[in-house]
């Protein structure tokens, strides 16, 4: 039998043993875990300890395609191409210059060109820098075959724009190019990168945000030096840009291009009931694809320095004296203001003397004789409108009606860099030249000369207002936005009123009648005669200081005269004075109208209109 003291001692020892186990077991577990972390998984955790952030690389989205109004075949697509990138930090410093020189040789550029894109302070950076784009597959293959000698060099797909329909569409569609430093400064917070391709002109620029799409992302884990350490990055796929369907009809565009020919000028075909632009041609034009070429900078400078200014869209970016086409505004103002009875005649003796200056009508002495409004308009008598402007309206009323027609202000068409033209007033002249407005100034403006200026599109809007009897719809080139995958229409552009006049309906009817009378009994009877459709029009001949005995030729028209506005088109053509045959505007306009309503090609329209024998000047048409 054990003693009580022994039992107590044993019990105490057991408790100490249990306590020791409780203490030692977690300690040994901790030691084993520490051994595992330091020895077995040490490299893993050391990597994790250095992984302080993620690097996000942008995957460019395919740019959206552009279609004409029929949305069948694209006018602009993307073509496979590549870009080459340098990650400077991956190149051993002692080999940097050798690697870059070798890469430059493969890319057919100089080492200095690459050095300009990678300043010395970036040479240890692990950021990826694009050094060249628009590289063909063969060049990429050559680089790939020498990859071991080119550390830090990578490449990726970077499609280029392929403009399938060049020529006159260049001013409408525009072109793209690498984003500039100034552009990136403005756009960087909208998802653009230093490697982005952006629209430079035309639709490409106007709707760049829609065409860009949503770029994808490649997310990689990087260490403290910026070096990628993740084996497999996370990929977020890009979404292609929206497809844009334009209001342009490719067949009509081609017809207008051929009708204008190689004559410096512009022509616009507009649907007055909606504001849709069916065709817009400015000559000379250019090939948008040249900006994809190696020597694009050289070609751009050639275009920039060309005296005929092929980069300018004359339909919206140049303004001209509207000449006698402005007599539409003058006649409207006269009728609405009851400034002078339309049936009362004014005598034209071929000239007027005012302020010590002799003003000659285009029909010299003895002049047109006695003319009422209808015949004064149809014969485009300057004496008639000089009298109305100076004695019956005055510059303030003339300017007010000009602005009501949309002159002197933006047409708000969806194209960048348009001009507003000019509606001069006495106040404007005082501010501009510090000179008093004279009666002779009013006379000049009354026939669309002097300081008065307008774009071809503004004149198309003027004709649209006559056709619509007081309404101008906002001119536009975008018809629809479509999903690039499903082709579903996501947005349709609705007609939007730009200007609505309070001029009496009876006034519009009379203006329409005298425009029709101009075709049947006025100055352009021969070039505007048409058996297919009734045309209403007005000619214009603008004097140009730098050209002696040469003039800008205008023709503004709508057709059919006897149809409702929704079935009509408006056509405006200007042929500049620098052409060998500047009188072509009426002929070109009639060819366009004939081709559209007879569903004919240019050659067929010319033949049916009997214009094939025209080989010399026909004479001035006011």
Task: Label the predicted regions.
Residues 1-295, 319, 344, 396-404, ...:
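Periplasmic/cell-envelope proteins involved in peptidoglycan metabolism and beta-lactam response
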Residues 2-6, 13, 75-76, 222-233, ...:
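Beta-lactam-recognizing serine transpeptidase/beta-lactamase-like catalytic domain environment
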